[in-house]
Amino acid sequence: MESVYLFSSGTLKRKANTICLETESGRKYIPVENVMDIKVFGEVDLNKRFLEFLSQKRIPIHFFNREGYYVGTFYPREYLNSGFLILKQAEHYINQEKRMLIAREIVSRSFQNMVDFLKKRKVRADSLTRYKKKAEEASNVSELMGIEGNAREEYYSMIDSLVSDERFRIEKRTRRPPKNFANTLISFGNSLLYTTVLSLIYQTHLDPRIGYLHETNFRRFSLNLDIAELFKPAVVDRLFLNLVNTRQINEKHFDEISEGLMLNDEGKSLFVKNYEQALRETVFHKKLNRYVSMRSLIKMELHKLEKHLIGEQVFGSEE
């Protein structure tokens, strides 16, 4: 199952058992059988009947604004939610020791994934290894988040050494709005990854509102932000380098906005095409002794967390 991306403006309707997008240029029909979720970037109209159809077919729909920022999600009625597991999620959040175990594991493994990403590209990452040790010694989540933020800034400076075109270097991480080409690409990629993880959470018994590294507060969802941290190097950062160093993306794919930049529709379309390809790419899983897609790896992490919460397996350990 894959994501459907809509950049055109128009009206979304149900036609028989398909999704129909009506635009000035005509109608586009999308069979629902293989749709995991819908990501809307254009200006679309829809009605309650269409949302009922998506709910019946268990398809989340994510909305992004013109600049590519995530706005919100229509999250269908949770058909797999388990009251028992929700209680376990809450218990592991409220109990500081249990929460720290999960949060520390996420940070530690995300650091290791950054190190592996750099080592594959012949970049020394000794300082990140030191941050990993600091994370293991952190006493609370706030301290852990501070360590993670400092490490990621250093990590991005190392990525800059791999960028062939200096105009596309990160220099300093900026957001809302991103100030340069690199930050625009990374922010857009992260937004896509967050919604991908959110849609995959919907296919589990987990509640996306209860996270462990990111605070569970008035933010609608936080668990997807936690799990996405593990996959940013392999998905978003790798894609960023590939698009820039192969010169697939250039200045023509960006528009200036107030105090920053955004990807235009051509740039977004190019990015999501390569993003979906990255999610389909496979890696060899030693334990399973077979190749699995990146999307499948994300879902496997969610199942590991489920098992941890009910006491079947320690999160991060090999099955």
From Swiss-Prot:
Mn(2+) binds at residues 148, 214, 229. GO terms for molecular function: DNA binding; DNA endonuclease activity; metal ion binding. The keyword Kinase does not apply. Its EC number is 3.1.-.-. CRISPR (clustered regularly interspaced short palindromic repeat), is an adaptive immune system that provides protection against mobile genetic elements (viruses, transposable elements and conjugative plasmids). CRISPR clusters contain sequences complementary to antecedent mobile elements and target invading nucleic acids. CRISPR clusters are transcribed and processed into CRISPR RNA (crRNA). Acts as a dsDNA endonuclease. Involved in the integration of spacer DNA into the CRISPR cassette. Homodimer. Forms a heterotetramer with a Cas2 homodimer. This is CRISPR-associated endonuclease Cas1. It comes from Thermotoga maritima (strain ATCC 43589 / DSM 3109 / JCM 10099 / NBRC 100826 / MSB8).
